[in-house]
């Protein structure tokens, strides 16, 4: 299965039990910042934004004072799981990033999708990739 298939079929799919509700954008990005696959709507990000995200995984709390930036959009960092999941909020939407052994799984959402639904979609794929040794 290609990485693009994971994005299309497991991240950009309808939310379970909520037909027509789906993430706004999603991607799988290598920890080196290389894009493995992304939705057409995923923002173009800067290397320093990815560096900040990786630093926060290694030093939890690093992004809290400045916020998480991706594609020029600033998200307020909210409670995640140290070293495993970063969550951010902006207005009626937000972002979830799950770290796997080799990659980062990104999900970006807007209402009517809820933070919990985004977390579920992103973390489910991230956990699967971890189980596969990825």
UniProtKB/Swiss-Prot annotation:
Q: Where in the cell is it found?
A: Cytoplasm, Cytoskeleton
Q: Which residues carry this modification: Phosphothreonine?
A: 114
Q: Which cysteines share a disulfide bond?
A: 13-118
Regarding how it is modified after translation, the entry says: Phosphorylated by MAP kinases.
Q: Does the keyword Cytoplasm belong to this entry?
A: yes
Classification via InterPro entries: PFN, PFN_euk, PFN_sf, Profilin_CS
**Short name of one Pfam family for this protein?**
Profilin
GO MF, one example:
actin monomer binding
Q: Where is this motif: Involved in PIP2 interaction?
A: 84-100
Q: Which GO terms describe its cellular component?
A: cell cortex; cytoskeleton
Q: Which UniProt keywords apply?
A: Actin-binding, Allergen, Cytoplasm, Cytoskeleton, Disulfide bond, Phosphoprotein
**Family membership noted in the UniProt record:** Belongs to the profilin family.
Q: What else is known?
A: The variability of the residues taking part of IgE-binding epitopes might be responsible of the difference in cross-reactivity among olive pollen cultivars, and between distantly related pollen species, leading to a variable range of allergy reactions among atopic patients.
Q: What task does this protein carry out?
A: Binds to actin and affects the structure of the cytoskeleton. At high concentrations, profilin prevents the polymerization of actin, whereas it enhances it at low concentrations.
Q: Quaternary arrangement and interactors, per the entry? A: Occurs in many kinds of cells as a complex with monomeric actin in a 1:1 ratio.
What name does UniProt use for this protein? Profilin-2
Organism expressing this protein natively:
Olea europaea
Source organism phylogeny: Eukaryota, Viridiplantae, Streptophyta, Embryophyta, Tracheophyta
